[in-house]
Amino acid sequence: MGQRASNTTPVIFKNVRVPKENLLAGEGEGFKKAMAALDITRPMIAVGSVGIARTALELATQYAKKRVQFGVPIAQHQAVQFMLADMAKDIEAARLLVWKAAWLADQGIRNSKEAAMAKAFAADVAMQVTANAVQIYGGMGYTKWHPVEKLMRDAKVIQIYEGTAQIMRLVIARQLLLETERTLY
C-alpha cells in the first residue's frame, strides 16, 4: 500500500550469544529499553503524519481554487470550505501535540503518554485529511495521476507501525491511570 520506497523485513537471530560487555542494558532489560526508545521515535513518526496532512491540505486547497463546477471554483462551495477548515484545525492540533511530546523528550522528561497521544492523533488526522483531500479531488483523487492517493496510502500505514491506534490508546489510558493513582494517594 503506502511508503513503497521503505521496505520492511524481519531479522531473525538464532542461537546468538552476546558478550556481557556488548549488552546495551542489563540482562532482561532489553524490552524496557526498546519501549523507552518508542517514547522518542513516536513523536518523529507523528511529525511525518503532520507533514503528510499538510501536503494533502495544500494540494486540496490549490485544486479547490482551480476546479470549476457549475460555473464556480469548488472552493466557493461551503461544504468544501468546511472540509478545508476542519483539515487545517486538526493539522494544527496534531502539530502542537507533536511539539509537546518532542519538547518533553528533549528535556529528558518521561513522555510515554504524550508521545502516544501525538502519534495516535497525528496518524488519525493524516488519514482523515488525506481522505478529505481525495474527496475534494473527486474521481480524479482516486487515480495515480494525482499525489493525494499516494498520501492517503502513506497515511494508512502510519496508523499501524510503531504501535497501532489501539495500542496508543492503551498506552495513554495506562499512563492516565498511573498519574491519577499518584495524585489520589
Question: What residue ranges belong to the model's regions?
Answer:
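FAD-binding subdomain of flavoenzyme oxidoreductases
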Residues: 1-10
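A short local loop/turn or secondary-structure capping micro-motif enriched for an aromatic residue
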Residues: 3, 20-21
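Alpha-helical interface subdomain recognition
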Residues: 10-15, 20, 26-29, 35-185
